[in-house]
């Protein structure tokens, strides 16, 4: 009984001595609140820097990223100017951001005919869904900017994925 009591006393003494060390352990790994960087709108689209990308055989629209506008921010956001040309002759230009970690996207501004930008009134991030109407966002997420849900390392990696037609980490079987 004495040896059990003694061992218990030693255990409790060590546990009490170490508890302040372990108490701070969780604090060391607190997750920080994500903070978005201030966004600078890019220059107007340039024809020579437009890179087409494949979305789906189910759409007649054509999709382009302005490679000159492409950035990978320290805040984990891929930003890019997107041009969508419809089969009927419509033209839609937006400056957008994509958060791979959260699988979200956001429109910062819409492009005007004169090349200027009109800031978006909707500032919230929305989930990227692989549905027909927004398939181009899912394609950018899955095939080019966020392979496996992980953000590309830098602009060069994103540009190379767009030029190749897919990210090299996407395995096709």
Describe each region flagged by the PLM:
Residues 18-20:
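N-terminal signal peptide c-region/cleavage motif recognized by signal peptidases
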Residues 1-10:
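Bacterial N-terminal signal peptides that target proteins for export
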Residues 118-173:
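C-terminal partner/receptor-binding element of secreted or periplasmic proteins
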Residues 24-95:
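N-terminal secretory signal peptides
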Residues 94-104:
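A short, surface-exposed beta-strand/turn
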Residues 11, 22, 172-173:
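Long, low-complexity intrinsically disordered regions enriched in Ser/Thr, Asp/Glu, Pro/Gly
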Residues 102-128:
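A short, surface-exposed interaction/processing loop segment used at functional sites
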């Amino acid at each position: 009984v004495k040896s059990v009591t003694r061992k218990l006393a030693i255990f409790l003494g060590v546990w009490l001595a170490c508890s302040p060390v372990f108490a701070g352990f969780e604090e060391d790994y607190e997750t920080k609140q994500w903070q978005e960087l201030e966004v600078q709108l890019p220059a107007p689209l340039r024809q020579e820097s437009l890179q087409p990308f494949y979305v789906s055989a189910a759409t007649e629209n054509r999709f382009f990223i302005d490679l000159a506008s492409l950035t990978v921010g320290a805040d984990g956001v891929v930003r890019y100017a997107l041009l969508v040309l419809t089969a009927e002759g419509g033209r839609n230009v937006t400056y957008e951001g994509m958060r791979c970690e959260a699988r979200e996207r956001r429109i910062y501004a819409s492009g005007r005919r004169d090349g200027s930008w009109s800031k978006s009134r909707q500032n919230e991030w929305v989930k990227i869904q692989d549905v027909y109407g927004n398939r181009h966002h899912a394609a950018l997420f899955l095939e080019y900017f966020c392979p496996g849900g992980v953000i590309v390392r830098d602009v060069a990696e994103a540009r190379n994925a767009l030029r190749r037609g897919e990210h090299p980490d996407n395995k096709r079987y």
